[in-house]
């Protein structure tokens, strides 16, 4: 029986060798291999295009999200600072109002007029405060180049170094944005 098994094994080996050597099988195998290689190349190419398209899509999504965020921030800033133009136009009139109120009243009529001006001034400031306008505090404070504009320097032992000694023109802020810096004299 062992001889029979050995004989069958040898026949199978010979048949395999003959099949491998026949020209028809070798052509089919080469064609199959080249067709498989072409298909693999197509798969690789399509995979690369898919990866590129996915990356482009993700970048476009991120760009769009950034755009939406910028538009939202711009919209909020426009809403927050909508009164800036109006306030900038009103400030010179407010300065003139304050200068007019510094006049000394000598008679009753002038005193009455000044009281009326003070009431109008107070109402104007209240309306500006409702919109978020604040006066920038200056005298006695440390000089801050973001809020103060130094137009003079002086040496005064009564004040700390770099402190605001005198204010020549009031400064104003709208919420957290400086509309006009205070014009001040600074101690060295």
From Swiss-Prot:
Molecular function in Gene Ontology: adenyl-nucleotide exchange factor activity; protein homodimerization activity; protein-folding chaperone binding; unfolded protein binding
Give the quaternary structure: Homodimer.
Region ranges (Disordered): 1-31
In the UniProt record, the gene name given for this protein reads grpE
User: Can you name this protein?
Assistant: Protein GrpE
Is the keyword Cell cycle assigned to this protein?
no
Residues spanning the signal sequence: none
Q: Which Gene3D superfamilies match?
A: 3.90.20.20, Head domain of nucleotide exchange factor GrpE (2.30.22.10)
Is Glycoprotein among the key words of this record?
A: no
Chain coiled-coil ranges? none
* GO CC, any one term: cytoplasm
Compartment(s) of residence: Cytoplasm
Please provide the Gene Ontology terms (biological process) for this protein.
protein folding
- Record field: compositional bias (Basic and acidic residues): 1-16
The record describes the protein's role as: Participates actively in the response to hyperosmotic and heat shock by preventing the aggregation of stress-denatured proteins, in association with DnaK and GrpE. It is the nucleotide exchange factor for DnaK and may function as a thermosensor. Unfolded proteins bind initially to DnaJ; upon interaction with the DnaJ-bound protein, DnaK hydrolyzes its bound ATP, resulting in the formation of a stable complex. GrpE releases ADP from DnaK; ATP binding to DnaK triggers the release of the substrate protein, thus completing the reaction cycle.
Instruction: Quote the InterPro entries the UniProt record gives.
Output: GrpE, GrpE_coiled_coil, GrpE_head
What CDD domains does the annotation carry? GrpE
Keywords, alphabetical: Chaperone, Cytoplasm, Stress response
Give the family per the record: Belongs to the GrpE family.
């Amino acid at each position: 029986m062992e001889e029979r098994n050995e004989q069958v094994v040898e026949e199978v080996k010979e048949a395999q060798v003959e099949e491998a050597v026949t020209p028809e099988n070798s052509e089919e195998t080469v064609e199959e291999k080249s067709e498989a290689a072409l298909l693999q190349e197509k798969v690789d190419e399509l995979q690369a295009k898919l990866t590129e398209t996915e990356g482009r899509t993700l970048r476009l999504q991120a760009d769009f999200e950034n755009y939406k965020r910028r538009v939202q921030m711009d919209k909020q800033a426009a809403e927050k600072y909508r009164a800036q133009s109006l306030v900038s136009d009103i400030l010179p009139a407010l300065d003139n109002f304050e200068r007019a109120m510094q006049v000394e009243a000598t008679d009753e009529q002038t005193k009455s007029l000044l009281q009326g001006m003070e009431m109008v001034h107070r109402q104007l400031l209240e309306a500006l405060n409702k919109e978020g306008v604040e006066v920038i505090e200056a005298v006695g404070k440390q000089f801050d180049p973001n809020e103060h504009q130094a137009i003079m320097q002086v040496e005064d032992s009564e004040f700390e170094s770099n402190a605001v000694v005198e204010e020549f023109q009031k400064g104003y802020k709208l919420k957290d944005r400086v509309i006009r810096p205070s014009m001040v004299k600074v101690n060295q």
